[in-house]
Design a protein with these regions (language model features):
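Structured aminoacyl-transfer and RNA-binding surfaces used for tRNA recognition/handling
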Residues: 1-261, 271, 275-300
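Conserved catalytic-core motifs characterized by acidic clusters
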Residues: 265
Length: 303
């Protein structure tokens, strides 16, 4: 991927003395080995709570941090105390990318640390160690069959690879944003929300259509219709009153040339399906706006 390992920071579970759940030293040691392979002598720090992290900050050389269950424990109920009876659960280890100390708003968030809500660190991955079960008496016991559940944010990892906090700066979205700027004559920086929604929704619409889904008023087809129509409404906010999907969809398609054969077979049908929906909705919009204009001219205020 090309991410600088010096900008990677990880967190582990500090343990719960009350419930007899040990500190996740094993994960910390494994992380030290991983960092060492990258030429980094990763020091370990015990933080505890996010509030304590905001007071302490991080020290030079620290890359591995122990936090409490509010940060590094997974269950349906959140923390250790609120884990539902009978549920599987366990500690987790999260991976963060560092965008630089200058990104932290100390006045609002305190000193920077991985679990801060400030802009310095962004979580890009998480390993949940499903190794416990909560018993009827509230205690915890080890599961007979344990597993590791990894989750990684593809777009966040891509953003970290280009050192950008904005996933819409990645190659998956940037061509779409640039085309929207060209069509609308407006800049992304002043219209981030509308352009992000358009790019995100049209990508989703493309992928749904590529699997054979068509816009309708029922179930999945209705979800597809809503995506397309919301993108068009946001385009209206940008002053784009003409059909524009034919300029955007081919840019999305370029990112998915390696899709499975079953999807590739239907891909050629995507653009006609989406543009038909666009044209139909624009006609509906025009009729609706025309009626609203008539009502306004009649003096009807809505009060």
């Amino acid at each position: 991927v090309g991410i600088d390992p010096h900008k990677i920071y990880v967190t582990c579970f500090i343990g719960s003395e009350k419930y007899g759940i040990p500190k996740d030293i094993e994960s910390a040691k494994i992380w030290q080995t991983v960092f060492k392979k990258a030429g980094i002598d990763a020091k370990i720090a015990e933080i505890g709570t996010a509030e304590q992290g905001a007071e302490r900050g991080i020290k030079e050389g620290e890359h591995i941090f122990f936090y409490d269950d509010h940060e590094n424990w997974w269950s349906r109920g959140g923390g250790v105390e609120t884990t539902p009876i009978g549920d599987p659960c366990g500690p987790d280890s999260e991976v963060f990318y560092d965008f630089g100390e200058d990104k932290q708003d100390v006045a609002e968030y305190g000193k920077s640390h991985p679990a801060s809500d400030g802009a310095r660190f962004m979580e890009i991955g998480n390993q949940v160690f499903m190794q416990y079960k909560r018993n009827e008496d509230g205690s915890f016991s080890e599961l007979k069959h344990k597993n590791i559940d990894f989750g990684g944010g593809l777009e966040r990892i891509a953003a970290a690879a280009i050192n950008s906090f904005d996933v819409f700066e990645t190659s998956m979205f940037k061509p779409l944003i640039q085309k929207l700027e060209e069509i609308s004559g407006k800049r992304y920086k002043e219209n981030t929300s509308d352009m992000r929604i358009i790019a995100d929704h049209l990508r989703g619409a493309y992928l749904l259509s590529a699997q054979g889904l068509v816009p309708s008023n029922r179930k999945q087809g209705y979800a597809l219709r809503r995506l397309i129509r919301r993108a068009i409404l946001k385009a209206q906010n940008l002053g784009i009153e003409q059909d524009f999907l034919a300029q955007i969809i081919p840019l999305i398609e370029k990112n998915y040339t390696d899709l499975s054969d079953s999807i590739l077979d239907t891909r050629k049908e995507v653009l006609p399906v989406l543009t038909r929906e666009e044209q139909a909705f624009r006609k509906t919009l025009k009729r609706g706006l025309k009626e609203l204009h008539k009502l306004r001219e009649s003096g009807l205020t809505g009060k």
